Amino acid sequence: MRVLILGSGVIGTTSAWYLSKAGCEVVVVDRQSGAGLETSYANGGQLSFGYTSPWAAPGVPLKAVRWLFERHAPLSIRPTTDWNQYVWLARMLRHCSAERYAVNKSRMLRLSEYSREALEALSAETGITFEGRRLGTIQLFRTQQQLDAAVRDIELLTQYGIPYEVLSPHQLAKFEPGLVDGSVRFAGALRLPHDQTGDCYLFTQRLAALAAKRGVEFRYGCKVQRLEVDGPRVTGAWINGALERADCCVVALGSYSPLLLAPLGLRLPVYPLKGFSLTLPMIDASRAPVSTVLDESYKVAVTRFDERIRVAGMAEVSGYDVSLNPRRRATLEMVVQDVYPGCGDLGRGEFWTGLRPATPDGTPVIGATPYQGLFLNTGHGTLGWTMSSGSGRYLADLICCRPCEISSEGLDMFRYLVSTIPCPQECAPCVPPTP
């Protein structure tokens, strides 16, 4: 089977890897000059398998109103003329109930835990390195109210058998001694000892190189113009003015996926959630994080690589704008100075932004569509790095008609019922096109 993958971020690249291993002929196209140069380039570096949570959570609507007036708000909204922005926000608000939060988090945990297993197996098989650390993640709570609110997450962690530790302020220093030098006295923390860290860009680049050795063809500098449709089937894509035919097309274009699908009558509720990062040269290892921490108040993570510190987070709903907002840099600098003062050189920091493809419920969209031969792997939001290996392996099983190792419930686009065309029975999510 010839598979055409549109997008060479971490999602497209892991999809290519697993489809190649399944025996498919794989071609990957991307508009950039190499793999992982957009949203995968400088994300937070956290492999948050256990911390996985949707942004749509109880209390967020009221917090969002308050955040409108805060300089360092973790979530901000910049109105645009795009009606999709308001439709997406309305859908997200509907998922902020405790009931929906539990359902969505459960789906996300299912995929994240599977992704942990997939990455472990991939790493053991290939020996791939990406400045990874297996020292856990710590969620920091500045207030007792935040700590108390973590109870609902702890209940789901217990349900899924995910190890965790609730840390007192005194216990924090055992795992992250550098916090002692900070100006914040935290109320407590939640530690997930099995979570990991690593550079997503390094992983994507190196996995692409390994996939190329297996015969996967990567074509860069390619503009994907539209999908080719023949009746109920997608038969390829127009790229740089030429038709590239394939038995199966995988759309892994992140936030840009809905733009390609719209002409087919598919209204995919994926919208860009703009994130920011600041990468600092490490100047004092004793003041740096041992692994990674997430400041719950600002939704900012501070992560250690070999010789660098990555400070990343926040979310800005502002359409497809990729300009660098100096106020967001100020927030990142404030947080790292609060928690790990003197760990990195702020003067030489690399400020970056990326558009994270978010769904209203937080769960990505992986699987079949109403069109035969067209599959999706997109909408991972802030957790593309975390979910990438599991998403790629799961998708390869679907496309190649192999039994999936996890439930497909709630993972494909049919949960939204937003297509303007009927879904053919032979193209149900659990019945991929015949190879």
UniProtKB/Swiss-Prot annotation:
The entry's cellular-component GO terms read: cytoplasm; plasma membrane
Which GO terms fall under biological process for this protein? D-alanine catabolic process
Identify the cofactor(s).
FAD
UniProt entry tagged with the keyword Iron: no
InterPro entries noted in UniProt? DadA, FAD-dep_OxRdtase, FAD/NAD-bd_sf
The pathway noted for it is: Amino-acid degradation; D-alanine degradation; NH(3) and pyruvate from D-alanine: step 1/1
User: What is the role of this chain?
Assistant: Oxidative deamination of D-amino acids.
Q: What is this protein called?
A: D-amino acid dehydrogenase
Organism equals Xylella fastidiosa (strain M12)
